């Protein structure tokens, strides 16, 4: 892990198109401003972890019984 020290108003550049700027330091809290292209996802750590957990649950296999019930329901709705 690269560790860099920055003061309020100073920035870190990543490649040509990402900038992380220290906006303020207040007690034990640091406010960061992040400029990045829309194609780059930027999340707080806890939000990213929650997204990953949701993705794991969504990717779980569906049982044959649940799948058959869904098909039966869809068939009834279309008639």
From Swiss-Prot:
Similarity field: Belongs to the CsrA/RsmA family.
> What InterPro entries is this protein classified in?
CsrA, CsrA_sf
Chief site of localization: cytoplasm
NCBIfam families referenced in this protein's UniProt entry, alphabetically = csrA (TIGR00202), PRK01712.1 (NF002469)
Q: What is the organism lineage in this UniProt record?
A: Bacteria, Bacillati, Bacillota, Bacilli, Bacillales
A Gene Ontology biological process in which this protein takes part is:
mRNA catabolic process
Protein name per Swiss-Prot or TrEMBL: Translational regulator CsrA
Keyword vocabulary terms for this entry: Bacterial flagellum biogenesis, Cytoplasm, Repressor, RNA-binding, Translation regulation
């Amino acid at each position: 892990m690269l560790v860099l020290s920055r003061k309020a108003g100073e920035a870190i550049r990543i490649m040509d198109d990402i900038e992380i700027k220290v906006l303020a330091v207040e007690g034990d809290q640091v406010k960061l401003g992040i400029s990045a292209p829309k194609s780059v996802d930027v999340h707080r750590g806890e939000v990213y972890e929650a997204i990953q957990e949701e993705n794991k649950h969504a990717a779980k296999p569906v049982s044959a019984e649940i799948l058959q019930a869904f098909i039966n329901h869809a068939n009834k709705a279309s008639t």
